[in-house]
Design a protein with these regions (language model features):
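Thiamine diphosphate
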Residues: 12-89
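N-terminal glycine-rich anion-binding loops that anchor highly charged ligand groups
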Residues: 2-16
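Conserved thiamine diphosphate
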Residues: 51, 89, 97-133
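Structural motif
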Residues: 6-8, 116-118, 138-141, 183-189, ...
Length: 235
């Protein structure tokens, strides 16, 4: 059985339980930070294997990122077990941070929904009577979310060496060019905004930025701007 988890705070009890199952060799545990990516990754596993794949996320807007994959699973009758962590019902509609209305958030796209508030929850229908497709269990957790503060779980982690990327320092790009333009993506190639700004000022080149708020006097929406044939010819 494969399980795909997107780490978070409220789903810590589920994450730790599945981690222990993984250590015992009972499941194949996959970690994906982005919930939308995680859901489609799980959808692919379920489609290839024909087995239900649980996806686990924290509360709030994280749940909404599952929606596209849940719809796809519904349309194609692919078994997907959506496990979403939630705050207790008493905190709903109180203005608590990130308290999204998660109950029935996927509407009719799921074959079954349960808002689980206790350790024992009677299912209204046997799962084997349901048509294949996504099932949503919204599980409420009260704090404390973690049972103890020991470091025993750290023994099961595999520590890998950090990846080192060789990034050229600003000032070494295109030094033989007298005219040019700097097209800056969201991550700026790993360089700081100050370094890019200094580099642009040194060369006297204009900046086209995907994130214009980071730079003063920058042309915004680089991906759209640079796909214009007229502008490309002018450049």
């Amino acid at each position: 059985t494969d399980v795909v988890i997107s780490p978070g705070s409220r789903n810590a009890p589920l994450s730790m339980a599945f981690h222990q199952a993984s250590v015992k060799g009972l499941i194949n545990l996959h970690i994906r930070i982005d919930e939308r990516t995680a859901a489609f990754f799980a959808l692919g596993i379920a489609k290839a294997s024909g087995r239900p794949v649980p996806i686990v996320c924290t509360s709030g807007t994280a749940v909404a990122n599952y929606h596209p994959a849940v719809l796809e699973a519904s349309h194609t009758n692919i078994p997907l077990l959506v496990l979403t962590a939630d705050r207790p019902a008493s905190l709903r509609k109180t203005g608590a941070n990130q308290t999204t209305e998660q109950a029935r958030i996927f509407g009719k796209a799921v074959r079954y929904f349960a808002d689980v508030s206790g350790s024992v929850y009677p299912m209204e229908l046997p799962f084997n009577s349901l048509q294949s497709g996504p099932v949503h269990l919204n599980i409420q957790f009260e704090e404390p979310l973690v049972g103890d503060k020991s470091d025993n779980w750290l023994n099961d982690l595999t520590i890998s060496a950090p990846k080192v990327f060789d990034r050229k320092a600003p000032g070494t790009f295109y030094t033989k060019s007298t005219r040019g333009v700097l097209a800056i993506g969201h991550d700026r190639g790993g360089l700081s905004a100050e370094a890019v700004k200094e580099f642009a000022e040194k060369l006297g080149w204009p900046v086209i930025a995907e994130d214009p708020l980071t730079f003063e006097n920058a042309t915004s929406h680089a991906s759209v701007f640079l796909t214009s044939k007229t502008i490309a010819d002018d450049l």
